[in-house]
Amino acid sequence: MTRIIITGANGKMGHVIRSVVAGREDCTVVAGVDFNTQAADFPIYKTIAEVQEEADVIIDFSNPALLDDLLTYSAAKSMPLV
């Protein structure tokens, strides 16, 4: 099963990705990152550095200002970022 982190998890596209993943059996959202930490079926953090869950990929629909932090995290974890 593919474990996903969604950045921008509470935005419009984040909600679309959450909905798509919820209807699948081969992947799951393990964490989200968003300035709005509104409750979800998974933990949502304000920064990528706070995420403790193991994941296989980051799907990014966040603000471009967060790109440097996302690239640093992705490289440190050897995790694809799309």
Name these PLM-found stretches.
Residues 1-5:
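Extreme N-terminal starter segment of soluble prokaryotic enzymes
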Residues 72-82:
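ADP-ribose/adenylate-binding Rossmann-like module
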Residues 6-18:
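N-terminal Rossmann NAD(P)H-binding glycine-rich loop of SDR-like oxidoreductase domains
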Residues 43-54:
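Short amphipathic alpha-helix with an adjacent loop that forms part of the alpha/beta core around
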Residues 58-74:
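Beta-loop-alpha module in the N-terminal Rossmann-like domain of NAD(P)-dependent dehydrogenases
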Residues 22-42:
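NAD(P)-binding Rossmann-fold cofactor-contacting core
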Residues 56-57, 80:
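Structural motif
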